[in-house]
Amino acid sequence: MRWPDLKGLMMTQIYERVALIGLGLIAGSMAHAMRRGGVVGEITGYARSAETRKTAAEIGLVDRVCDSAAEAVKGADLVVLCVPVGAMASVATEIGPHLKAGATVSDVGSVKRAVIDAVAPHIPENVHFIPAHPLAGTEKSGPTSGFAELFDNRWCLIVPVEGTDKTATERLKEFWADLGAKVDEMEADHHDLVLAVTSHAPHLIAYTMVGVADDLGRVTDSEVVNYSAAGFRDFTRIAASDPTMWRDVFLNNKEATLEILGRFTEELFALQRAIRTGDGDHLHDYFTRTRTIRQGIIEAGQDTDAADFGRVKK
């Protein structure tokens, strides 16, 4: 989609040129949100897949689709790595020599310590490296999946490394705020633990539950599809997320994810025991306590209490 020229109506321009490396859901949504707000001058982009580059060019996702990551970052004031965590090091190696002095390199990865370890060694001293993580997404992927509203009222966590320039950090915060996000800072290891609780372990549980249904010989595929209740449909939506991205997340956040899965297993055993022994009080008390988390999410504006059971509205 070609966006109109909004320069006469736009907010203060934060970066003259932004390069997006990787052109999937997050990068595409960033491009749409940048155009919506008019907060950048030019957007360049690169994706490893020639098919993705072709599609991105055809739909006008960015102003210029480049044939290499090195070409895309030349002259860019902000470079955002929107690739799976496992690909970060190789991309950083490629773009390092071509980065503009004074530029900022950031990312959108769901793991932060591994990204810092992979990327930081390849960033020149005259370039700012400021990791970030927008807590937004859908199960969709690819250059046509993005939309400008993805980050609206969602958190973007900025994870500065030691010695990060404060002015460059504030500039990146302003950029994400203008894309619609609420912005906060968090230390890398704490980020990885928090996300293991709120995102990584839940994804693994969803993959597992859908896998159990797929393996259960006594239940046919048609029954799983036709009689899926709201809870299972939520699992299938999560389990439809990009396999490469989530493989890399789990392999690069092992310690925190395994810690949370260990605690989950202990809780699950306790619930199994309560069911086996008929301990209804334990079950009721547990469900009452956990119910308050949902209400807290709604009150924080991160979801609504509107009924939505995945039915197509007529």
Q: Which residue stretches match the model-derived regions?
A:
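Short, Lys/Arg-enriched N-terminal segments with co-localized hydrophobic residues
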Residues: 2-10
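NAD(P)+-binding Rossmann beta1-loop-alpha1 motif at the extreme N-terminus of oxidoreductases
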Residues: 11-75
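Residues at the starts of beta-strands that form the adenosine-phosphate
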Residues: 17, 42, 128, 155, ...
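Rossmann-like NAD(P)-binding element
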Residues: 69-99, 103-106
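Rossmann-like NAD(P)(H) cofactor-binding subdomain of soluble oxidoreductases
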Residues: 91-144
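Internal alpha-helical scaffold of NAD(P)-dependent oxidoreductase catalytic cores
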Residues: 150-237
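Interdomain hinge/lid region at the active-site interface
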Residues: 221-289
